[in-house]
């Protein structure tokens, strides 16, 4: 089995076989979920602070699809970057399970990945994080350097994609890449 290497939002390597699908409604053991925010409006066309740039219509549909298609059991907590597009990405999921979206500045865009990595490693199993295309690849790269492997499609870190991080012996050992809803 070849490990993946994540660079510049692109996965490279050999596809590893996926484990069998999980049964809906069961808690995914030993897993933390990293979701890249869904499709947002154009950065160049947005005239206000980038922190308030919302999801596009397609992004709103992606966020609903993430929540509607969730088959990993009830999350224990949902955290988001302070950026509106991240909050909007996981709000439908939080609503589905009766949770509030908690703001976590350590997973915000342009934050040193070491801060995000620390928060993610300390998170209890079943925690969901919404973050950005600059943070998630750095976190995953750091975990790969520590021996974590990735299974799943080599579709890259597209908006709305998710990494499911599985722990073994207290460390993240395996990661499933889940392509974004279309």
Feature locations, PLM:
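Low-acidity, Ser/Thr- and Arg-rich intrinsically disordered low-complexity segments
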Residues: 2-8, 16, 22
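Intrinsic disorder/low-complexity segments enriched in polar/small residues
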Residues: 10-11, 20, 61
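Long, intrinsically disordered low-complexity tandem-repeat segments
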Residues: 14-16, 26-27
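Active-site-proximal alpha-helix that buttresses catalytic centers in soluble enzyme cores
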Residues: 30-114, 137, 148-153, 157-160, ...
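A broad structural signal for short, well-ordered beta-strand segments within beta-sheet-rich domains
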Residues: 75, 172-173
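Active-site-adjacent alpha-helix immediately C-terminal to a catalytic or transition-state-stabilizing loop
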Residues: 114, 118-172
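Short, solvent-exposed aromatic-acidic interface loops
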Residues: 175-182
């Amino acid at each position: 089995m070849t490990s993946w290497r994540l660079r510049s939002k692109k996965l490279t390597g050999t596809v590893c076989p996926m484990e069998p699908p999980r049964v809906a409604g069961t808690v995914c053991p030993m897993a933390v979920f990293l979701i890249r925010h869904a499709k947002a409006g154009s950065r160049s066309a947005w005239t206000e602070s980038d922190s308030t740039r919302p999801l596009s219509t397609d992004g709103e549909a992606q966020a609903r699809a993430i929540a509607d298609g969730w088959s990993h059991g009830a999350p224990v907590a949902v955290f988001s970057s302070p950026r509106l597009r991240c909050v909007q990405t996981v709000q439908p999921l939080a609503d589905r399970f009766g949770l509030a979206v908690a703001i976590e500045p350590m997973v915000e865009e342009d934050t040193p990945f070491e801060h995000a990595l620390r928060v993610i490693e300390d998170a209890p199993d079943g925690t969901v994080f919404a973050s950005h295309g600059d943070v998630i690849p750095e976190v995953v790269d750091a975990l790969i350097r520590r021996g974590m492997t990735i299974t799943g499609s080599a579709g890259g870190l597209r908006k709305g994609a998710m990494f499911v991080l599985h722990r073994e012996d207290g460390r993240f050992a395996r990661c499933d890449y889940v392509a974004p809803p279309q």
